[in-house]
Swiss-Prot record:
Cofactor dependence: [4Fe-4S] cluster
EC number: 1.5.98.3
Keyword Iron set for record: yes
Gene Ontology biological-process annotations: aerobic respiration; methanogenesis; methanol metabolic process
Organism: Methanosarcina mazei (strain ATCC BAA-159 / DSM 3647 / Goe1 / Go1 / JCM 11833 / OCM 88)
Oligomeric and partner information: The FPO complex is composed of at least 13 different subunits.
Protein name: F(420)H(2) dehydrogenase subunit I
GO cellular component: membrane
Annotated segments matching region Disordered: 1-21
Length: 177
């Protein structure tokens, strides 16, 4: 509300002597007030459109039933060779999404000795391969796993600990550096 002709200017000595009538607010260009008939016709129009376009078969699926052939350049879930990893953290510093953290983990299942290894949150990973390219010892490599290993229902399941990353290779007690 306000009156464009008369404004109260504090400190100017000018005071409003009477309260002006409120100025009506004009609707925006192209807008019209919502009415029951207009809203109902819009809802019916959308229901008609939805019923017309209900497919008889599923258009998409959560996972393909048959795995697609992969190209040589495909970058899948990373694998970690714990015997080569020195825990330097270059992979974590290189990651553009900060998806890699360096954590202390056992050198082998059941071992009490721990070292620093990468932990990758594949929910944030771009699979760009920078961590693999920058690893000075070649401890990280790109796997070919893409559907079974990455489709999860909860985000916490997308956290790839060093134990999960080192699916094939673990350090033997005598090989530790």
């Amino acid at each position: 509300m306000g009156c464009p002709e008369v404004q109260d200017r504090p400190g100017s000595g000018y005071e409003l002597e009477e309260t002006p009538a409120p100025v009506p607010v004009e609707p925006c260009l192209g807008s019209r007030p919502w009415t029951l008939s207009g809203g109902l016709s819009m809802v019916l129009k959308n229901i008609k459109y939805a019923l017309k376009n209900i497919p008889k078969e599923r258009v998409t699926r959560l996972c393909p039933e048959v795995e697609s052939p992969l190209s040589e350049r495909f970058r899948g879930l990373q694998t970690l060779d714990k015997s080569k990893c020195i825990g330097c953290g270059i992979c974590a510093n290189t990651c553009p999404n900060s998806a890699i953290k360096i954590v202390k983990a056992p050198i082998a299942p059941g071992s009490e000795k721990k070292r620093w290894f990468p932990q990758i949150d594949i929910g944030h990973c771009l699979f760009c391969g920078l961590c693999i390219d920058q690893c000075p010892k070649g401890a990280l490599s790109s796997g070919k796993e893409y559907c079974k290993g990455m489709v999860k229902w909860a985000h916490k399941d997308l956290l790839m600990t060093p134990e999960k990353l080192a699916r094939e290779v673990d350090i033997q007690e005598g090989d530790e550096r």
